[in-house]
């Protein structure tokens, strides 16, 4: 298996020369894993392999760098069966939500060769000069289905969300807290090179790095959201978001498949390219036309505290919710358990919410569990929290959140142990 050299300023090396280093801490994202195994400094933006000639965009624009579908791929003969299952799960996610399909065939060229290399990395889009295009997934990478989905998205043509040329309107980078060997991982693309499909900035994108990515002092953020409500929404890989899916559908012209289908989908949803009779719905919505609540994950079927519809009145009410994993060891779930709630009020009203407490494994980036509030544009990721410090102001009072209309959506995700919370809400 050949792996071409990668080039960027002050660094010309070969991936063959990358030291294995110490094993990655489990259950982090691809950037952390690559940094810990010693390969991050050899990869553009921390997990991207590049050839000498490249064009950098949020998504690729050149037609010759998009894959003819189904995208052919092969597994290295020594690729672990457990890791293979994670790859197939990630591929299934993209196939169910888009028109992108995959076909295992090592005898077609070019194709993607998936192997257990050093770290988690991929090229961006099809590389016409390569017969076998490498996609490296060491075992730590496959602890999390959506770390794999992130790398597959690179292979299909996605760059990082935080590399957008307009990113300074939405985030700032504290370079004083970035590992000096990895400052280039936060390279920003120029507007002339950028193709972000005129999409809104998605803090929760599966292509966004986390708030503490490559930090020297892990008690301080590296990435600061201009809107601090979204500080913990960045990079926790709970799922590829509705916006990620929509951009993939635009990139591969998937909407053409349902061009003659009446769009009856609500809340910004649209006919699913894989089955035009179904809808691709924003996170938190389900049913035939996105008219109802998204179903809970299979593991929550016996959890009476998971999900439901609540009606707000002008009198404050409280409710308790929980999502549980039954995982209490050093391992975590590859895909989080999830529950959703809709809080509704009468027309002309909005909903005021205070989160009284959260009981959950706490981390700066909420990489294990998270509670999400969607208060306005339901097609975008909302603020996420996993610690009491995230929900209290400097006066030790619960922060007050208010929806823009008569609907608020609450999502709870857990990959480890459980997440319990108490909320007070009312119509205003």
UniProtKB/Swiss-Prot annotation:
Cofactor annotation remark: Binds 1 zinc ion per subunit.
GO molecular function: metalloendopeptidase activity; zinc ion binding
Enzyme kind, highest EC tier: hydrolase
GO BP term (any one): molting cycle, collagen and cuticulin-based cuticle
Cellular component terms (Gene Ontology): extracellular region
Location(s), subcellular: Secreted
Residues covered by the Peptidase M12A domain: 58-255
Listed name of the protein: Zinc metalloproteinase nas-27
């Amino acid at each position: 298996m050949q792996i071409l050299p990668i080039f960027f300023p002050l660094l010309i090396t070969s991936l063959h020369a990358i030291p294995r280093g110490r094993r990655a801490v489990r259950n982090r994202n691809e950037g952390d894993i690559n940094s810990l195994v010693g390969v991050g400094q050899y990869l553009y933006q921390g997990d991207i392999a590049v050839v000498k000639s490249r064009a950098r965009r949020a998504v690729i624009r050149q037609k010759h760098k998009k894959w003819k579908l189904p995208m052919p791929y092969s597994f290295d003969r020594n690729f672990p069966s457990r890791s293979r299952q994670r790859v197939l799960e990630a591929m299934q996610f993209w196939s169910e939500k888009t028109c992108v399909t995959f076909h295992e065939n090592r005898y077609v060229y070019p194709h993607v060769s998936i192997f257990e290399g050093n770290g988690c990395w991929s090229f961006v889009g099809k590389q016409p000069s390569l017969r076998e295009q490498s996609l490296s997934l060491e075992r730590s990478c496959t602890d999390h289905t959506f770390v794999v989905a992130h790398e597959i998205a690179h292979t299909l043509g996605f760059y990082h969300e935080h590399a957008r040329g307009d990113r300074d309107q939405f985030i700032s980078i504290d370079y004083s807290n970035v590992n000096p060997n990895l400052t280039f991982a936060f390279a920003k693309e120029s507007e002339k090179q950028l193709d972000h499909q005129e999409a809104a900035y998605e803090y929760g994108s599966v292509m966004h790095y986390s708030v503490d990515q490559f930090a020297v002092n892990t008690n301080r953020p590296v990435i600061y959201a201009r809107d601090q409500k979204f500080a913990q929404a960045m990079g926790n890989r709970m799922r590829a978001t509705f916006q990620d899916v929509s951009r993939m559908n635009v990139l591969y012209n998937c909407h053409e498949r349902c061009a003659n289908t009446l769009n009856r989908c609500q809340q910004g949803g649209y006919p699913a390219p894989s089955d035009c009779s179904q809808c691709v719905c924003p996170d938190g919505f389900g049913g035939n036309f996105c008219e109802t609540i998204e179903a809970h994950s299979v593991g929550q079927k016996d959890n009476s505290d998971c999900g439901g519809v609540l009606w707000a009145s002008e009198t404050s009410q409280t409710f308790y919710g929980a999502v549980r994993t039954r995982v209490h060891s050093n391992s975590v779930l590859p895909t989080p358990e999830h529950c959703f709630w809709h809080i509704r009020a009468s027309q002309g009203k909005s909903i005021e919410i205070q989160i009284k407490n959260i009981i959950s494994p706490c981390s700066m980036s909420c990489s294990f569990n998270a509670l999400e509030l969607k208060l306005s544009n339901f097609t975008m990721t909302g603020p996420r929290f996993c610690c009491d410090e995230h929900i209290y102001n400097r006066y030790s009072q619960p922060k007050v959140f208010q929806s823009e209309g008569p609907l608020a959506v609450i999502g709870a995700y857990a990959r480890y142990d459980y997440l319990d919370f108490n909320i007070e809400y009312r119509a205003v």
